[in-house]
Amino acid sequence: SNSLFEEVRPIVNGMDCKLG
């Protein structure tokens, strides 16, 4: 269940880093 969130968190973190 948390697997999906754990797999999506790095993507969101990468996007945030790119935006910042």
From Swiss-Prot:
An annotated GO BP: proteolysis
Catalytic activity: Selective cleavage of Arg-|-Thr and then Arg-|-Ile bonds in prothrombin to form thrombin
GO cellular component assignments: extracellular region
EC number: 3.4.21.6
Domain of life: Eukaryota
Ranges of residues in domain Peptidase S1: 11-20
A single MF term (Gene Ontology): serine-type endopeptidase activity
Keyword terms: Blood coagulation cascade activating toxin, Calcium, Disulfide bond, EGF-like domain, Gamma-carboxyglutamic acid, Hemostasis impairing toxin, Hydrolase, Protease, Prothrombin activator, Secreted, Toxin
Localisation: Secreted
UniProt modification remark: Gamma-carboxyglutamate residues are formed by vitamin K dependent carboxylation. These residues are essential for the binding of calcium.
Tissue: Expressed by the venom gland.
Residue ranges of every copy of the Gla domain listed in the record: 1-10
UniProt keyword Membrane, yes or no: no
PTM-bearing positions, type 4-carboxyglutamate: 6-7
Family to which the UniProt record says this protein belongs: Belongs to the peptidase S1 family. Snake venom subfamily.
Additional facts recorded: Is classified in the group D of snake venom prothrombin activators, since it requires the mammalian factor Va for maximal activity for the cleavage of prothrombin. The venom of this species does not contain its own coagulation factor V-like. In contrast to blood coagulation factors that circulate as inactive zymogen in plasma, venom prothrombin activators are always found in the active form in the venom.
Biological role: Snake prothrombin activator that attacks the hemostatic system of prey. This protein is functionally similar to blood coagulation factor Xa.
Complex and partners: Heterodimer of a light chain and a heavy chain; disulfide-linked.
Protein name listed in UniProt: Venom prothrombin activator notanarin-D
